[in-house]
Amino acid sequence: MALFRKKDKYIRITPNNSLKGSVSHNVPEVPDELFAKCPACKHMIYKKDLGLAKICPTCSYNFRISAQERLTLTVDEGSFQELFTSIETKDPLRFPGYQEKLQKAKETTGLHEAVLTGKAMVKGQQIALAIMDSHFIMASMGTVVGEKITRLFELAIEENLPVVIFTASGGARMQEGIMSLMQMAKVSAAVKRHSNAGLFYLTILTDPTTGGVTASFAMEGDIILAEPQSLVGFAGRRVIETTVRENLPDDFQKAEFLQDHGFVDAIVKRTELRDKIAHLVAFHGGGQ
């Protein structure tokens, strides 16, 4: 009997074709270019609020920026003279897909390689400058990166210039094998010659600075600065924990941790780096 029939758990709705098309599909789309999500605090940020320095207004996280953006923030307008743009990798291993990956990175970043090198003025002080860009194959160090930085030091010796390097890297470039690892020794030898000439070398560690770059010229500066919360290390956290069989501190391999343990001289806000560089260069004799 219908009187004792169990009631349906859900309401039944009969499709009505007359309703089709009555709902507007003209929902405005928000362009991806307008907002960015902060990796640290997870807030959605209107990109214009990040400013030129690209610093999160909520938690002060420093977004990764390109070499060109770094150049704009650091040097005197119109003073940069790019050098060593004609050096090309020989692709010693004929690594499959490597040339295509290089070409894509060049098109995406507008750079010749993972490091931008040249001479520039910072508040009237002339310097030899290198800026690594993590957007170019994670700023991995191959033969071209090593050669460009080595030549920069050699030029600095000839012209009696201080060297300033913004480091960022995922390590040695695996597509070039042992040749990429040899760049560590080559650049370090150039750093030593520059030091023997009595010239100033300043490094600024940015996020991330890891692998062979950390194990060589990144940590060889006369003074070592770092941006806040930058990841700086050699091997990865999980590799170390597996090896030593211990849990590492939460802030392990952060710039602040390195400063507390004497590996970094100072943590400097991105917006203050230009003034700090100019001050340190002038204090150590300046660039002629």
UniProtKB/Swiss-Prot annotation:
Statement: the UniProt record of this protein carries the keyword Membrane: no
Molecular function in Gene Ontology: acetyl-CoA carboxylase activity; ATP binding; carboxyl- or carbamoyltransferase activity; zinc ion binding
Leader sequence segment: none
Reaction catalysis annotation: N(6)-carboxybiotinyl-L-lysyl-[protein] + acetyl-CoA = N(6)-biotinyl-L-lysyl-[protein] + malonyl-CoA
Biological or metabolic pathway of the protein: Lipid metabolism; malonyl-CoA biosynthesis; malonyl-CoA from acetyl-CoA: step 1/1
Alphabetical keyword list: ATP-binding, Cytoplasm, Fatty acid biosynthesis, Fatty acid metabolism, Lipid biosynthesis, Lipid metabolism, Metal-binding, Nucleotide-binding, Transferase, Zinc, Zinc-finger
GO process annotations (BP): fatty acid biosynthetic process; malonyl-CoA biosynthetic process
Residues reported in the UniProt entry to bind Zn(2+): C38, C41, C56, C59
Cellular component, GO, one term: acetyl-CoA carboxylase complex
Protein EC: 2.1.3.15
Cofactor(s) required for function per UniProt: Zn(2+)
Subcellular location: Cytoplasm
Matching Gene3D superfamilies: 2-enoyl-CoA Hydratase, Chain A, domain 1
Keyword Transcription belongs to the record: no
Assembly notes: Acetyl-CoA carboxylase is a heterohexamer composed of biotin carboxyl carrier protein (AccB), biotin carboxylase (AccC) and two subunits each of ACCase subunit alpha (AccA) and ACCase subunit beta (AccD).
Similarity annotation: Belongs to the AccD/PCCB family.
Entry function: Component of the acetyl coenzyme A carboxylase (ACC) complex. Biotin carboxylase (BC) catalyzes the carboxylation of biotin on its carrier protein (BCCP) and then the CO(2) group is transferred by the transcarboxylase to acetyl-CoA to form malonyl-CoA.
NCBIfam families (UniProt xref): accD
Descriptive protein name: Acetyl-coenzyme A carboxylase carboxyl transferase subunit beta
Species this chain originates from: Streptococcus pyogenes serotype M4 (strain MGAS10750)
